[in-house]
Protein backbone atom coordinates (compact mmCIF):
# COMPACT_ATOMS: atom_id res chain seq x y z
CA UNK A 1 0.00 0.00 0.00
CA UNK A 2 1.32 3.47 -0.90
CA UNK A 3 0.61 6.73 0.88
CA UNK A 4 1.06 10.24 -0.47
CA UNK A 5 3.81 12.29 1.14
CA UNK A 6 1.34 15.06 2.00
CA UNK A 7 -0.98 12.65 3.83
CA UNK A 8 1.88 11.05 5.75
CA UNK A 9 3.37 14.38 6.82
CA UNK A 10 -0.06 15.68 7.82
CA UNK A 11 -0.66 12.64 10.02
CA UNK A 12 2.76 13.03 11.61
CA UNK A 13 2.13 16.71 12.35
CA UNK A 14 -1.22 15.88 13.97
CA UNK A 15 0.42 13.11 16.02
CA UNK A 16 3.25 15.37 17.21
CA UNK A 17 0.80 18.15 18.07
CA UNK A 18 -1.39 15.81 20.13
CA UNK A 19 1.66 14.62 22.04
CA UNK A 20 2.63 18.21 22.85
CA UNK A 21 -0.87 19.11 24.00
CA UNK A 22 -1.07 16.18 26.34
CA UNK A 23 2.38 17.06 27.74
CA UNK A 24 3.44 13.42 27.83
CA UNK A 25 6.06 12.63 30.41
CA UNK A 26 6.64 9.07 29.23
CA UNK A 27 8.80 10.23 26.33
CA UNK A 28 10.35 7.35 24.37
CA UNK A 29 13.80 7.84 22.87
CA UNK A 30 13.61 7.46 19.06
CA UNK A 31 15.29 4.48 17.42
CA UNK A 32 16.67 6.84 14.81
CA UNK A 33 17.14 10.60 14.45
CA UNK A 34 17.50 11.98 10.94
CA UNK A 35 18.35 15.34 9.40
CA UNK A 36 18.12 15.03 5.64
CA UNK A 37 17.86 17.27 2.60
CA UNK A 38 16.46 15.41 -0.38
CA UNK A 39 13.71 15.30 -2.98
CA UNK A 40 10.04 14.65 -2.25
CA UNK A 41 10.34 11.26 -3.90
CA UNK A 42 13.09 10.21 -1.50
CA UNK A 43 11.29 11.73 1.48
CA UNK A 44 8.30 9.53 0.75
CA UNK A 45 10.47 6.40 0.45
CA UNK A 46 12.23 7.22 3.74
CA UNK A 47 9.00 7.73 5.68
CA UNK A 48 7.34 4.64 4.20
CA UNK A 49 10.38 2.53 5.13
CA UNK A 50 10.45 3.83 8.71
CA UNK A 51 6.72 3.26 9.16
CA UNK A 52 6.94 -0.22 7.65
CA UNK A 53 9.72 -1.19 10.07
CA UNK A 54 7.76 0.16 13.03
CA UNK A 55 10.64 2.38 14.11
CA UNK A 56 10.20 5.26 16.52
CA UNK A 57 11.87 8.11 14.68
CA UNK A 58 12.58 11.82 14.67
CA UNK A 59 13.13 13.37 11.26
CA UNK A 60 13.83 16.84 9.89
CA UNK A 61 14.01 17.77 6.22
CA UNK A 62 14.92 21.45 6.60
CA UNK A 63 17.98 21.91 8.83
CA UNK A 64 21.01 23.60 7.27
CA UNK A 65 23.44 21.00 8.64
CA UNK A 66 21.43 18.10 7.18
CA UNK A 67 22.92 15.24 5.18
CA UNK A 68 22.18 15.74 1.47
CA UNK A 69 20.71 12.61 -0.09
CA UNK A 70 21.07 13.02 -3.87
CA UNK A 71 18.12 12.29 -6.12
CA UNK A 72 20.25 10.07 -8.37
CA UNK A 73 20.90 7.48 -5.68
CA UNK A 74 22.29 4.83 -8.04
CA UNK A 75 25.19 7.03 -9.13
CA UNK A 76 25.84 8.95 -5.90
CA UNK A 77 28.13 8.07 -2.99
CA UNK A 78 25.54 7.08 -0.42
CA UNK A 79 26.52 7.85 3.17
CA UNK A 80 28.72 5.14 4.78
CA UNK A 81 29.55 3.50 1.43
CA UNK A 82 32.89 3.93 -0.34
CA UNK A 83 31.36 4.37 -3.79
CA UNK A 84 28.06 4.47 -5.62
CA UNK A 85 26.36 1.19 -6.47
CA UNK A 86 26.85 1.66 -10.23
CA UNK A 87 30.54 2.52 -9.78
CA UNK A 88 31.12 -0.59 -7.68
CA UNK A 89 29.32 -2.74 -10.24
CA UNK A 90 31.55 -1.41 -13.01
CA UNK A 91 34.70 -2.02 -10.98
CA UNK A 92 33.68 -5.63 -10.29
CA UNK A 93 33.02 -6.13 -13.99
CA UNK A 94 36.34 -4.58 -14.98
CA UNK A 95 38.19 -6.88 -12.60
CA UNK A 96 36.44 -10.04 -13.82
CA UNK A 97 36.40 -9.22 -17.53
CA UNK A 98 39.73 -7.50 -18.14
CA UNK A 99 42.06 -8.03 -15.18
CA UNK A 100 41.22 -11.71 -14.66
CA UNK A 101 40.76 -12.91 -18.23
CA UNK A 102 40.43 -16.68 -18.53
CA UNK A 103 42.28 -16.73 -21.85
CA UNK A 104 44.73 -13.90 -22.53
CA UNK A 105 44.92 -14.92 -26.19
CA UNK A 106 41.26 -14.14 -26.76
CA UNK A 107 39.60 -10.75 -27.01
CA UNK A 108 36.91 -9.06 -25.00
CA UNK A 109 34.19 -7.59 -27.22
CA UNK A 110 32.71 -4.44 -25.66
CA UNK A 111 29.33 -3.54 -27.14
CA UNK A 112 27.97 -0.16 -26.07
CA UNK A 113 25.21 2.27 -27.00
CA UNK A 114 25.85 5.93 -27.72
CA UNK A 115 24.85 7.24 -24.29
CA UNK A 116 27.59 5.08 -22.71
CA UNK A 117 30.38 6.20 -25.06
CA UNK A 118 32.37 7.87 -22.26
CA UNK A 119 32.54 4.64 -20.26
CA UNK A 120 33.63 2.69 -23.34
CA UNK A 121 36.31 5.32 -24.10
CA UNK A 122 37.63 5.04 -20.55
CA UNK A 123 37.98 1.27 -20.92
CA UNK A 124 39.51 1.58 -24.39
CA UNK A 125 42.26 3.82 -23.03
CA UNK A 126 43.07 1.22 -20.36
CA UNK A 127 42.63 -1.89 -22.48
CA UNK A 128 43.33 -0.89 -26.11
CA UNK A 129 44.00 -4.49 -27.17
CA UNK A 130 40.30 -5.36 -26.83
CA UNK A 131 37.61 -4.52 -29.39
CA UNK A 132 34.89 -1.89 -28.97
CA UNK A 133 31.70 -1.49 -31.00
CA UNK A 134 29.08 1.22 -30.72
CA UNK A 135 25.73 -0.35 -31.53
CA UNK A 136 23.41 1.93 -33.48
CA UNK A 137 19.60 1.87 -32.98
CA UNK A 138 18.86 0.29 -36.35
CA UNK A 139 19.18 -3.12 -38.00
CA UNK A 140 20.73 -4.76 -34.92
CA UNK A 141 21.02 -8.18 -36.55
CA UNK A 142 23.24 -6.94 -39.38
CA UNK A 143 25.54 -5.09 -36.97
CA UNK A 144 25.87 -8.13 -34.71
CA UNK A 145 26.64 -10.42 -37.64
CA UNK A 146 29.44 -8.06 -38.66
CA UNK A 147 30.85 -7.94 -35.13
CA UNK A 148 30.90 -11.74 -34.86
CA UNK A 149 31.89 -12.36 -38.51
CA UNK A 150 28.76 -14.44 -39.00
CA UNK A 151 28.37 -13.03 -42.53
CA UNK A 152 31.69 -14.58 -43.56
CA UNK A 153 30.52 -18.01 -42.37
CA UNK A 154 27.29 -17.67 -44.36
CA UNK A 155 29.18 -16.56 -47.48
CA UNK A 156 31.47 -19.59 -47.26
CA UNK A 157 28.44 -21.85 -46.97
CA UNK A 158 26.79 -20.24 -49.99
CA UNK A 159 29.96 -20.59 -52.05
CA UNK A 160 30.22 -24.27 -51.14
CA UNK A 161 26.56 -24.88 -52.02
CA UNK A 162 27.07 -23.51 -55.54
CA UNK A 163 29.33 -26.43 -56.48
CA UNK A 164 26.46 -28.90 -56.21
CA UNK A 165 22.94 -27.56 -55.79
CA UNK A 166 21.60 -31.07 -55.15
CA UNK A 167 23.90 -31.52 -52.17
CA UNK A 168 22.20 -30.92 -48.82
CA UNK A 169 24.58 -29.43 -46.27
CA UNK A 170 23.65 -28.85 -42.63
CA UNK A 171 25.01 -25.46 -41.63
CA UNK A 172 25.06 -23.48 -38.40
CA UNK A 173 26.72 -20.06 -38.81
CA UNK A 174 30.01 -19.92 -36.93
CA UNK A 175 31.36 -16.88 -35.17
CA UNK A 176 34.99 -15.82 -35.04
CA UNK A 177 37.08 -17.97 -32.71
CA UNK A 178 39.15 -15.21 -31.10
CA UNK A 179 36.41 -13.96 -28.73
CA UNK A 180 36.65 -14.78 -25.03
CA UNK A 181 33.72 -12.78 -23.65
CA UNK A 182 31.23 -10.01 -24.43
CA UNK A 183 30.60 -6.97 -22.22
CA UNK A 184 27.33 -5.09 -22.79
CA UNK A 185 27.20 -1.43 -21.77
CA UNK A 186 23.67 -0.39 -22.70
CA UNK A 187 20.32 0.53 -21.25
CA UNK A 188 17.26 -1.71 -21.24
CA UNK A 189 15.78 -0.56 -24.55
CA UNK A 190 18.89 -1.62 -26.48
CA UNK A 191 19.91 -4.52 -24.25
CA UNK A 192 16.61 -6.41 -24.42
CA UNK A 193 17.00 -6.59 -28.22
CA UNK A 194 20.71 -7.17 -28.80
CA UNK A 195 21.47 -9.67 -26.02
CA UNK A 196 19.11 -12.39 -27.37
CA UNK A 197 20.57 -11.87 -30.87
CA UNK A 198 24.14 -12.21 -29.63
CA UNK A 199 23.12 -15.30 -27.65
CA UNK A 200 21.57 -16.90 -30.75
CA UNK A 201 24.97 -16.80 -32.47
CA UNK A 202 27.24 -17.21 -29.43
CA UNK A 203 25.24 -19.46 -27.11
CA UNK A 204 28.07 -20.60 -24.83
CA UNK A 205 29.92 -17.28 -24.68
CA UNK A 206 30.49 -15.63 -21.27
CA UNK A 207 28.59 -12.34 -21.27
CA UNK A 208 28.58 -9.54 -18.70
CA UNK A 209 26.68 -6.35 -17.86
CA UNK A 210 25.90 -4.03 -14.99
CA UNK A 211 22.37 -4.02 -13.55
CA UNK A 212 21.71 -0.89 -15.63
CA UNK A 213 20.79 -3.16 -18.53
CA UNK A 214 17.52 -4.12 -16.81
CA UNK A 215 16.78 -1.01 -14.70
CA UNK A 216 13.86 0.03 -16.89
CA UNK A 217 12.27 -3.41 -17.03
CA UNK A 218 8.91 -3.56 -15.23
CA UNK A 219 8.93 -7.25 -14.31
CA UNK A 220 11.70 -9.57 -13.16
CA UNK A 221 10.46 -12.13 -15.68
CA UNK A 222 11.66 -9.74 -18.41
CA UNK A 223 15.18 -10.73 -17.35
CA UNK A 224 14.72 -13.80 -19.53
CA UNK A 225 16.22 -11.64 -22.30
CA UNK A 226 19.49 -11.65 -20.32
CA UNK A 227 19.53 -15.32 -19.33
CA UNK A 228 23.03 -16.54 -18.33
CA UNK A 229 24.51 -13.02 -18.39
CA UNK A 230 26.73 -12.23 -15.39
CA UNK A 231 25.53 -9.24 -13.32
CA UNK A 232 27.18 -7.90 -10.12
CA UNK A 233 24.25 -7.84 -7.69
CA UNK A 234 23.35 -9.42 -4.35
CA UNK A 235 20.94 -12.31 -3.89
CA UNK A 236 18.95 -10.24 -1.41
CA UNK A 237 18.54 -7.43 -3.94
CA UNK A 238 17.23 -9.91 -6.51
CA UNK A 239 14.76 -11.27 -3.94
CA UNK A 240 13.53 -7.73 -3.25
CA UNK A 241 13.12 -7.08 -6.97
CA UNK A 242 11.13 -10.30 -7.40
CA UNK A 243 8.67 -9.08 -4.74
CA UNK A 244 8.62 -5.47 -5.89
CA UNK A 245 5.50 -3.31 -5.98
CA UNK A 246 7.02 -0.46 -8.00
CA UNK A 247 6.50 -0.24 -11.76
CA UNK A 248 10.23 -0.34 -12.57
CA UNK A 249 13.07 -2.52 -11.29
CA UNK A 250 15.14 0.66 -10.99
CA UNK A 251 12.69 2.03 -8.42
CA UNK A 252 13.00 -1.08 -6.25
CA UNK A 253 16.81 -0.85 -6.36
CA UNK A 254 16.57 2.80 -5.28
CA UNK A 255 14.23 1.80 -2.44
CA UNK A 256 16.72 -0.86 -1.31
CA UNK A 257 19.57 1.66 -1.29
CA UNK A 258 17.58 4.05 0.89
CA UNK A 259 16.73 1.17 3.22
CA UNK A 260 20.46 0.41 3.41
CA UNK A 261 21.12 3.99 4.47
CA UNK A 262 18.42 3.82 7.16
CA UNK A 263 19.57 0.42 8.46
CA UNK A 264 23.19 1.58 8.74
CA UNK A 265 22.18 4.87 10.34
CA UNK A 266 20.20 2.93 12.94
CA UNK A 267 23.18 0.62 13.58
CA UNK A 268 25.48 3.60 14.20
CA UNK A 269 23.03 5.52 16.37
CA UNK A 270 22.19 2.50 18.54
CA UNK A 271 25.57 0.73 18.54
CA UNK A 272 24.17 -2.42 16.93
CA UNK A 273 27.41 -3.59 15.33
CA UNK A 274 27.25 -6.94 17.13
CA UNK A 275 24.10 -7.76 15.18
CA UNK A 276 26.37 -8.45 12.17
CA UNK A 277 23.86 -6.96 9.76
CA UNK A 278 24.41 -7.00 6.00
CA UNK A 279 23.21 -4.21 3.72
CA UNK A 280 20.76 -5.25 1.01
CA UNK A 281 23.10 -4.01 -1.70
CA UNK A 282 26.29 -5.61 -0.38
CA UNK A 283 27.95 -8.68 1.10
CA UNK A 284 30.07 -7.06 3.83
CA UNK A 285 28.87 -6.70 7.41
CA UNK A 286 28.28 -3.17 8.65
CA UNK A 287 31.41 -2.01 10.46
CA UNK A 288 32.23 0.86 12.79
CA UNK A 289 35.36 2.15 11.05
CA UNK A 290 35.97 3.04 7.41
CA UNK A 291 33.56 3.15 4.52
CA UNK A 292 31.66 0.07 3.38
CA UNK A 293 32.74 -1.78 0.25
CA UNK A 294 29.81 -3.82 -1.05
CA UNK A 295 32.06 -6.71 -2.17
CA UNK A 296 29.65 -7.66 -4.95
CA UNK A 297 29.58 -11.13 -6.48
CA UNK A 298 28.52 -11.97 -10.02
CA UNK A 299 25.02 -13.39 -10.36
CA UNK A 300 24.34 -15.49 -13.45
CA UNK A 301 20.89 -14.44 -14.56
CA UNK A 302 18.39 -17.26 -14.21
CA UNK A 303 14.68 -16.60 -14.29
CA UNK A 304 13.80 -20.20 -13.38
CA UNK A 305 13.31 -19.25 -9.72
CA UNK A 306 10.92 -16.43 -10.55
CA UNK A 307 8.58 -18.08 -13.05
CA UNK A 308 5.19 -19.39 -12.04
Model feature map: region roles:
Residues 2-10, 18-308:
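Extracytosolic ligand-binding ectodomains
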Residues 13:
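Conserved P-loop NTPase catalytic core
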